[in-house]
Amino acid sequence: MYLVVGLGNIGKEYKKTRHNIGFDVVDIIAEKYNIEINRQKFKGSYGEGRIGNEKIILLKPSTYMNLSGESVIEAANFYKIDKENIIVIYDDMSIDIGKLRVRSKGSAGGHNGIKNIIQHLNSDIFPRVRVGIGQPDENVVNYVLGKFSKDEREIIEKVLAMSAKACISIVEDGVTEAMNKYNGVKIEV
């Protein structure tokens, strides 16, 4: 069983912002596998389904980004999911737009949502899909809560689809295979 968590902030004002990429990827997976994310529990919205023979729980925490660990630990404990089977998808400023990076473990890298998840799990050993949003020329908060330009949106739509495929690959083939397949790929206009 896998817990697939997309990080983001709830509310219309955050829809399609850089910081909500995790929500967008979870929505793509939900659509592909006909999973309705309409149940409220674990301080978030979630749905249950299958990828092949594996049961998956798709989770969108409603705690706001910096407290995402509260939602993740509640769902993981309820379903008794191993940390190695918790996949977290989130935006990453240290990666260029058009790229993603799959990792099996690691530090928070300055991302407060990941920092909170690491604290609650008491471990940094869980797979993650880091989606590049590029470096801001402006205030970081305004940048991550801002929307993509038209040109960026064209690239991001393709990266979101690739990120969903990377999550599916982790479930079907394992994190190492997903890393080999998706790390280093760059999508351009």
UniProtKB/Swiss-Prot annotation:
TRNA binds at residues 14, 64, 66, 112. It is an enzyme of class 3 (hydrolase). GO terms for molecular function: peptidyl-tRNA hydrolase activity; tRNA binding. The active site is at residue 19. The keyword Protein biosynthesis does not apply. Gene3D superfamilies: Peptidyl-tRNA hydrolase (3.40.50.1470). Its EC number is 3.1.1.29. It catalyses: an N-acyl-L-alpha-aminoacyl-tRNA + H2O = an N-acyl-L-amino acid + a tRNA + H(+). The keyword Transferase does not apply. Its main location: cytoplasm. Keywords: Cytoplasm, Hydrolase, RNA-binding, tRNA-binding. GO terms for biological process: protein quality control for misfolded or incompletely synthesized proteins; rescue of stalled ribosome. It is found in: Cytoplasm. PROSITE patterns: PEPT_TRNA_HYDROL_1, PEPT_TRNA_HYDROL_2. The record marks 91 as: Stabilizes the basic form of H active site to accept a proton. One of its GO terms (cellular component) is cytoplasm. The record marks 9 as: Discriminates between blocked and unblocked aminoacyl-tRNA. NCBIfam families: pth (TIGR00447). HAMAP family: Pept_tRNA_hydro_bact. Hydrolyzes ribosome-free peptidyl-tRNAs (with 1 or more amino acids incorporated), which drop off the ribosome during protein synthesis, or as a result of ribosome stalling. Belongs to the PTH family. Monomer. This is Peptidyl-tRNA hydrolase. It comes from Clostridium botulinum (strain Hall / ATCC 3502 / NCTC 13319 / Type A). The lineage of its organism: Bacteria, Bacillati, Bacillota, Clostridia, Eubacteriales. The gene is pth.
